[in-house]
């Protein structure tokens, strides 16, 4: 685990984020959605313009490295006072396991606690096995959501949340 590092991303990293995503998304979603929907969502959420807009809208992107090799990325941001959302968390399939996802979540949690976070939310496709990982690290399903994303496609997700209130108190006491 000591070989893992995270750094904040910028607009200069958009091509790297897109490259990583193209290695993750087809494998992750090809059995959950039609090829047409996968391609539509890739263009909608991961085009250069879409990523620039997300960054301009306050999404904090980070890149995960293992021994200086980029192996994943995430983005997150505040969606309402004291509530933050994990917008994306993707790690190359060959690098799954070994606590890397937890390492990223802990990094994000520590960052947002400094900003007064009381909860971290995320959306996960209802058929995505990543739901099990999120439950294992303390997220709970708070509702189901079917979001029309255009072109006749829907995102059929669980909205999950991890309360950080106790962790926020522990964090404040450690300062």
What are these regions (language model features)?
Residues 8-14, 18-94, 105-107, 111, ...:
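Acetyl-CoA-dependent GNAT
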Residues 2-5:
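Extreme N-terminal starter segment of soluble prokaryotic enzymes
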Residues 9-11, 114-121:
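Short, charged low-complexity linear motifs
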Residues 118-131, 135-140, 147-175:
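C-terminal "cap" of GNAT-fold acetyltransferases
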Residues 33, 41-42, 99, 125, ...:
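Residues at secondary-structure transition points
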């Amino acid at each position: 685990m000591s070989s893992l590092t995270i750094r904040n991303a910028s607009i200069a990293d958009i091509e790297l984020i897109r490259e990583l995503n193209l290695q993750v998304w087809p494998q992750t979603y090809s059995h959950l959605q039609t090829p047409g929907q996968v391609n539509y969502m890739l263009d909608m959420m991961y085009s250069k313009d879409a990523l620039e807009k997300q960054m301009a809208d306050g999404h904090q992107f980070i890149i995960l490295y293992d021994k200086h090799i980029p192996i994943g990325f995430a983005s997150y941001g505040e969606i309402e006072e004291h509530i933050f959302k994990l917008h994306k968390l993707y790690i190359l399939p060959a690098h799954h396991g070994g606590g890397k996802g937890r390492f990223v979540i802990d990094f994000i949690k520590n960052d947002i606690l400094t900003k007064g976070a009381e909860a971290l939310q995320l959306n996960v496709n209802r058929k995505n096995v990543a739901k099990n990982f999120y439950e294992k690290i303390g997220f709970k399903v708070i509702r189901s959501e079917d979001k029309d994303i255009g072109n006749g496609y829907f995102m059929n997700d669980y909205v999950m949340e991890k309360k950080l209130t106790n962790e926020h108190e522990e964090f404040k006491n450690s300062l």
